[in-house]
A protein has these predicted regions:
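Short beta-strand/loop motif that positions the catalytic acidic residue
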Residues: 192, 198-200, 204
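Catalytic histidine-centered segment of alpha/beta-hydrolase-like enzymes
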Residues: 229-242
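Active-site loop/oxyanion-hole signature of alpha/beta-hydrolase fold enzymes
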Residues: 37-78
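Conserved alpha/beta-hydrolase catalytic His-Asp/Glu region
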Residues: 136-189
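Flexible "cap/lid" loop of the alpha/beta hydrolase fold
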Residues: 94, 103-132
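Conserved HGGG/HGGXW glycine-rich cap/lid loop of the alpha/beta-hydrolase fold
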Residues: 3-51
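Conserved alpha/beta-hydrolase "acid-adjacent" motif
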Residues: 205-211
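Gly/Ala-rich beta-loop-alpha elbow adjacent to hydrolase catalytic centers
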Residues: 81-85, 89
Length: 252
């Protein structure tokens, strides 16, 4: 894929229980270094949409985002998506292939992958802590330890994430509804390989990198593996990710 074939506009989608604020400063870095027009949308039930009920299917989440994405219908775009956001992106490409030029999927999965790879057993203690604790700081600390191999004890980052939670409270039922939607999602049978790039970390303690590998094999699409970052690759090694983005644009 050449630089000219890539879109100017890119939509960034987060995963389970996360919001657009968790992308920063990564999205701003992409805009500055790549010259992209970057957009973010919160999934229904989270972030700016926290007062809404989260749908029970990935297709409904995708449809909701389609209706809210303020871009002209004839303007092509790409999607950078993490984890559950990748499921939404795959479904979106399947339903609107004429608009979406490129998907970059980070540590994603689907119901076609074994359940112990979609949520690894070693992540379960932190998942449990995040769900049952009544204290936001304890919940966010558990999530950070689960998704990051480099910032699990970052006090400043924890403070920022707690502030996001205070601004946009999370309803436990919405987390469970997202989990249900993810568990039912099956990846489309066919998608154009030249519009797909899978990125994953071998050291992801939440979702096995093998899920990304299986999806890449399914579509005969390229995959690149990081050796040490955690599930939240944009947090753990943003430079590595941007270098991969530059690769598809033919930049050095």
């Amino acid at each position: 894929m050449t630089e000219l074939s890539l879109p100017r506009h890119w939509l960034f989608l987060r995963g389970l229980s996360r919001e657009s604020g968790h992308w920063q400063p990564f999205v701003d870095d992409c805009a500055a270094r790549l010259g992209w027009q970057c957009h973010t949308l919160d999934l229904p039930g989270f972030g700016s949409e926290h007062q809404r009920r989260s749908p029970l299917t990935i297709a409904e989440i995708r449809s909701d985002l389609q209706q809210r994405f303020a871009l002209p219908d004839d303007e092509p775009f790409g999607i950078v998506a993490l984890s559950l956001g990748g499921m939404v992106a795959l479904d979106w490409l399947h339903t609107e292939p004429q608009r979406i030029r490129q998907l970059i999927l980070i540590n994603s999965s689907s119901g076609d992958c074994p359940v112990w790879q979609r949520l690894q057993p070693r992540a379960l203690p932190q998942v449990f802590r995040g769900l049952v604790s009544r204290h936001i700081s304890t919940q966010e600390q558990a999530i950070m330890k689960m998704v990051s191999n480099r910032h699990g004890n970052n006090a400043a980052l924890l403070s920022r994430y707690v502030e996001l939670r205070n601004q946009h409270p999370i309803q436990r039922r919405n987390v469970l509804r997202q989990l249900w939607a993810a568990s039912r999602f099956r990846a489309p049978h066919t998608l154009p390989a030249d519009r797909l790039l899978f990125l994953a970390s071998r050291a992801d303690h939440m979702v096995s990198w093998q899920c990304s590998q299986q999806l890449a094999d399914r579509y005969q699409a390229p995959v690149a593996l990081h050796q040490s970052a955690g599930h939240d690759l944009p947090l753990d090694d943003p430079d590595w990710l941007i270098q991969r983005f530059e690769d598809i644009a033919g930049k050095e």
